[in-house]
C-alpha cells in the first residue's frame, strides 16, 4: 500500500493528501495518550482508538459516526498533519488513504484491476478488516481470480486486529469455492 500511496498521492483529495516526504511512524501507547491529553480526552482506550483509525473510511466527515467520535478521529488526522513539513502516517492510515484513492479515482482502480488477472493472498488468516476492505475495494466484482491461503490454526495476529472467520468472510464476499 505504501508504494500505491507514493505513486498516486496526488490523487488524494484535500485535506488528506500528504506531502511526498511524509514519515511513517509506529505510535505506542504513550504517543496516543499524549494526543488524548492534548485533545481533552485523557481516558480514551488507545487500543480501541487505534482500531477506529485503522477501520474508518475517508473522508471522515462523511462517515455515519457519532459526532464526538467523528470530531475526535478527525482531530487525530489533523494532529498527524499538523506540521506539513513532516506529516506522520501509520501503516493503517496509509491503508485508508489508498482505499480513498481507489474509491474516488475509478480510473486508477480500473488500471489496478487490469494489471492483475490473479491475486494470491498468503497468510490470509491474519488479514485485518481494514486490509480486507481495501481488497474488496480493489477487486470485488472485477473478475480477478483471488486465491486466499492460510491456516486458522496458525493465526497469530488476533492481537493486531486480524479478522474472525477470515476465510468464511472471503468465501461469502467473493463467492469463492
Predicted regions mapped to residue ranges:
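P-loop NTPase Walker
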Residues: 1-14, 110
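Conserved beta-strand -> loop -> alpha-helix junction used to position metal-binding or nucleic-acid-contacting
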Residues: 1-5, 17-29
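Active-site catalytic microenvironments for nucleophilic, acid-base chemistry
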Residues: 7, 80, 101-104, 137, ...
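Conserved RecA-like helicase ATPase core segment
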Residues: 14, 134-177
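Residue-level signal for alpha-helical context at structural boundaries
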Residues: 19-22, 116, 130, 142, ...
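Accessory N-terminal region flanking or inserted into the helicase ATPase core
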Residues: 28-120, 129-134, 158, 164
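Catalytic glutamate of the conserved HExxH
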Residues: 123
